[in-house]
A protein has these predicted regions:
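Outer-membrane beta-barrel porins/channels
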Residues: 4-5, 42-54, 62-279
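Outer-membrane beta-barrel pore proteins
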Residues: 2-8, 14-27, 70-76, 122
C-alpha cells in the first residue's frame, strides 16, 4: 500500500520495513485477515484432446490470508519484533473432466513465514532494521496422466498427484530517514527464498501396475522472488498526508518449474515442466 515502507503506523511495519519499529510505542500488536478471490477462466478455441472434452469452470476460489505482528522496545533506540504471515500461495481448481485436465486440475500452494526482526535508531534522522525469515512451503498438484487411453496405459483415466514440502530461509533489511518533522523516506528489501521441495508423485487409476509404474519420489525447485520498496510520506497538516510507493518484484526468478523423479526406474527423469514465464 502507499507509503508502506515509510509510514510505520503499526507493528505490520515488520514486514514492509523493520526500521519503522522505531516509530512505535513500547509494545504494539497488529493482526489482520485478507480475503482474496481470484478468477481464472479458460475458453477453448478448437483444440483436440482425445477423450477430454469437458467445459472449464472458474478455477478461482476464496482464500483467507492471516497475519499477525508484535513489536516491543528494549530501550528508547532498540526494538525487536516478530511477524507471522502467508506471503505467497493460493489455489486453482477446475472440475475433473474439463478439457485441460491433463495439464492441471488442482494446484494448491501454501506458505507460512515467520519473521523475527530488530531495529535500531542510529540518530534522530536514521533508523535501520533487519529481519530473518523462516518459510515453509507446501504444494499439491493434481492432473490426469494424459489425454488418451491405450491398452495397459489408461492415461486419461489415471490421476497423477504431486505432494511436496520444504523449509527454507531468507532475510530482509530496511532503512528509515526522517528528513523533516513532516517528511519521511523508507527503503526496504526482501531477499529471494529458494525452496527445494521433496515429496511423492502418485498415480491413481483403474490398473494397479500402471499406477505403481508412474509413482515415485519427486522433487522440484522454486525460487520465490525478491522485492524492493521505496516509500515516502509527507504530512500536509493535522488531517492530510501525501503517501507514495515505488515497488519492484523479481518475478522472472520463476521461469519454469521442473518436477523430477528421484526414485524407481525413471529416477532423474523430468515428469513434467511447468512453464510460468513470469516477467
Amino acid at each position: 500500500y502507499a507509503g508502506s515502507a515509510a509510514v510505520g503506523e503499526n507493528a505490520s511495519t515488520i514486514y514492509f520495513n523493520p526500521a519503522g519499529m522505531t516509530l512505535l510505542q513500547d509494545r504494539e500488536f497488529s493482526a489482520g485477515l485478507s480475503m482474496v478471490r481470484p478468477s481464472f477462466k479458460f475458453k477453448d478455441k478448437g483444440s483436440s484432446t482425445g477423450i477430454l472434452t469437458g467445459k472449464a469452470s472458474d478455477a478461482g476460489g476464496w482464500a483467507a490470508l492471516p497475519n499477525a505482528y508484535l513489536s516491543w522496545a528494549l530501550d528508547k533506540d532498540l526494538y525487536v519484533g516478530v511477524g507471522i504471515g502467508a506471503p505467497f500461495g493460493l489455489v486453482t481448481k477446475y472440475n475433473r473432466g474439463w478439457l485441460g485436465s491433463a495439464h492441471s486440475i488442482e494446484f494448491d500452494i501454501k506458505t507460512i513465514n515467520i519473521n523475527p526482526s530488530i531495529a535500531w535508531r542510529v540518530n534522530d534522522t536514521v533508523s535501520l532494521g533487519f529481519g530473518l525469515n523462516w518459510q515453509r512451503m507446501e504444494a499439491e498438484y493434481l492432473r490426469r496422466a494424459g489425454t488418451v487411453n491405450a491398452p495397459g496405459m489408461p492415461l486419461a483415466s489415471t490421476f497423477a498427484k504431486l505432494k511436496a514440502d520444504d523449509d527454507s530461509w531468507g532475510w530482509n533489511v530496511g532503512a528509515l530517514f526522517t528528513l523533516t518533522d513532516a517528511t519521511r523516506l523508507g527503503i526496504s528489501y526482501r531477499s529471494k527464498i529458494k525452496h527445494k521441495l521433496d515429496g511423492d508423485l502418485t498415480g491413481k487409476g483403474p490398473i494397479a501396475p500402471f499406477n505403481a509404474a508412474i509413482s515415485s519420489d519427486a522433487k522440484a525447485t522454486v525460487e520465490l522472488p525478491d522485492t524492493w520498496i521505496i516509500s515516502a510520506v509527507h504530512k500536509l497538516d493535522s488531517r492530510w498526508e501525501l503517501l507514495g510507493d515505488v515497488s519492484w518484484t523479481g518475478w522472472s526468478s520463476i521461469d519454469k518449474v521442473d518436477i523430477k523423479r528421484t526414485s524407481g526406474p525413471m529416477a532423474g527423469a523430468i515428469a513434467q515442466t511447468l512453464d510460468t514465464d513470469f516477467r
